[in-house]
Amino acid sequence: LFRSAVAYRDRRTEGMDRKVYEFIPEDDLYGRTGIQKQIFNTIYQLMAVKEQQPGQLEWAKSMLMIPDYFHFLLTGKKVQEYTNATTTQLVNPVTKDWDIELIDMLGYPRRIFHKIQNPGYELGRLTEDIQNRVGFDCKVVLPPTHDTASAVMAVPTQEEHALYISSGTWSLMGTELKEADCSKVSMQHNMTNEGGYDYRFRYLKNIMGLWMIQSVKKESAPDMGFGEICALASKETIRSFVDVNDARFLAPENMTAEVKSACEEAGEQIPQTIGELAAVIYHSLAKCYAKTAEEIEKLTGIDYSRIQIVGGGANAHYLNELTAEYAGKNVYAGPTEATAVGNFAAQMIAAGELKDLKAARACIAESFEINIFTSNQDTE
């Protein structure tokens, strides 16, 4: 380990997209990988290392994502789990393996990319050192190590085509496809094709999510609970909107000031209180969800009857109400701890306790409370 891990919201990768596009045009990169451009993707992280600390790539023997590094510490074995590996923007969606031609093109050393294994793969047992520390031994099974991939496993539906939002710091809104859509139209809509359990593709869009509320709370109302903030927002009449996908909200020095500035620049009412700030953010998120739902329906040709919300955002009742209102679809919210539940489900399938993903989702639907928020335009 050459140094401490870096934060993905830092500025190391600024301009690294242009460096990557010197080797491969942006359109071609999407056509090869199907992954949405995010400046913190591993493809740009590695380019930052190559440009800023080239010696580190020359010396490196392995590139492990954080979950894979934990698995290495537990077992002493190095592999890269499929769902997380796809988000590097270096995996071929057809072969489900590293795109070696692309890796060579970018000048990254092949040796650092280890074998990709699927969720459910039995990696091994705890190392002797770990056994001595914890007092027991056990098998280590790979879950979907990308948090959204685990969360999507926990979407409690039996519908073949479900529309979901994994709602937390980020809002990941999408559906599942059997084959990746790497078309130019898909790219223009900034959709991504991330790997999922059983080689399903999580066809989704990354939306800024509750990071905005978390930041405003920290700055303006650190002692107030999220439930209280939701309640205040529901009583406000302000109807200003901001583009929640604007990069200005990714890592601003002050989120409160940034939201106010965005409203002022758009000639809209400027929120003053924590309730007004929250109302602007919640309405803006819900409006974005509705627009994204329409985009996904057009891209897939499927009319989705409901929206399934999993993750911590399932507790944001006011946001769920607004989502149902703006999207014109019923919202089914829960479970809130979807990432942990999906992780556990993958391990239960591997252990033979559950037959498959369909059985796991049926079990989850029966085991957790699901709150329903009804749309006035309900067609179910």
What are these regions (language model features)?
Residues N92-T95, P119-L123:
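Short beta-strand to alpha-helix junction loop
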Residues E14, Y21-G34, Q38-I39, Y44-M65, ...:
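Active-site core segments that coordinate phosphate-bearing ligands/cofactors
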Residues I100, L106-G120, F344:
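A conserved helix-loop-beta module that forms one wall/lid of the active-site cleft
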Residues G76-N84:
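Enzymes and membrane/adaptor proteins characterized by extended Gly/Ser/Thr/Asp/Glu-rich
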Residues H114-E122, I229-S234:
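Short linear loop/turn motifs
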Residues D10:
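Carbohydrate-associated surface elements
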